[in-house]
Amino acid sequence: DQFAADDNWAAAQKLASRYRQDFATYQRFQQRADFIGRVHQLITSMTQLLGSPDDLIKPSTKKLATGLITDAKSALAFSPTLTKLSTALNERLTSYTTPLDIIVVSDNVTFVEVKSVGQVGTVAQKTIQLLPGDYVFVGKRKGYVTIQVPVALRPGDSGKEISVIAHEQI
């Protein structure tokens, strides 16, 4: 209990694991050990996600982060560390699920599309919305070499200009 009170969940987890067998018949100890294990696991998982934020581009990781934040709600009062991590992960998740305004610049003759997303069309300039992620912009024009422009969009990239112009003749 002292380790938990000190917000040292790793040490509390180690101690609870060590004595779990000795107190196998004590339901209260087992419940407390389960709770300590749960808080420790939440802290560990959230720390890992915050350490590699670009993983939040993947839908499965977004779902995992949402689940962790939800699971942590009942334990926030017991751990300032968990509260801090949960808040940080929630803010990070929000930044990766907020669409960005991206400005596509072309020459009014190149047909532009975003691979696996959709068509932009033949435009001089158009603002589209995309979530943070990795994209390939494709420019096609009859009689010209098709170009591909790989773009990594991250939170804060709103307003970024992407130029897609097929200019090399076949």
Model-found features: residue ranges?
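Short loop/turn and low-complexity linker motifs enriched in small/turn-promoting residues
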Residues: D6-A24, R28-Q41, S45-I170
